[in-house]
């Protein structure tokens, strides 16, 4: 009984650490995507001020 309880507790701790790691990793990916969007928007805005060619700026900035 005691070993079953310890095994269950250990399993719960492992599962909680996996869920915690997954949520931190998801936040990291989300922040990277957000930073990439900010970079693309800034690039596009600067390009439009310089060239005013929307097609060129879209292809240049991604």
Curated annotation (Swiss-Prot):
Proregion residues excised on maturation: 27-36
Principal cellular location given in the protein's record: secreted
Subcellular location as annotated: Secreted
GO molecular function: potassium channel regulator activity; toxin activity
GO cellular component terms attached to this protein's record: extracellular region
Keyword Disulfide bond: yes
Keywords: Disulfide bond, Ion channel impairing toxin, Neurotoxin, Potassium channel impairing toxin, Secreted, Signal, Toxin, Voltage-gated potassium channel impairing toxin
Paired cysteines (S-S): 43-61, 47-57
Tissue distribution: Expressed by the venom gland.
Keyword Disulfide bond among record annotations: yes
Secretion signal span: 1-26
Family note: Belongs to the short scorpion toxin superfamily. Potassium channel inhibitor kappa-KTx family. Kappa-KTx 3 subfamily.
Free-text comment about domains: Has the structural arrangement of two alpha-helices stabilized by disulfide bonds (CSalpha/alpha 2(S-S)).
Biological role stated in the UniProt entry: Potassium channel inhibitor (Kv).
Listed name of the protein: Potassium channel toxin kappa-KTx 3.3
């Amino acid at each position: 009984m005691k070993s079953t309880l310890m095994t269950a507790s250990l399993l719960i701790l492992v599962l909680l650490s996996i869920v915690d790691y997954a949520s931190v990793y998801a936040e990291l990916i989300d922040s990277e995507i957000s930073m990439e969007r900010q970079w693309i928007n800034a690039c596009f805005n600067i390009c439009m001020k310089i060239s005013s060619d929307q097609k060129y700026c879209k292809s240049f900035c991604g």
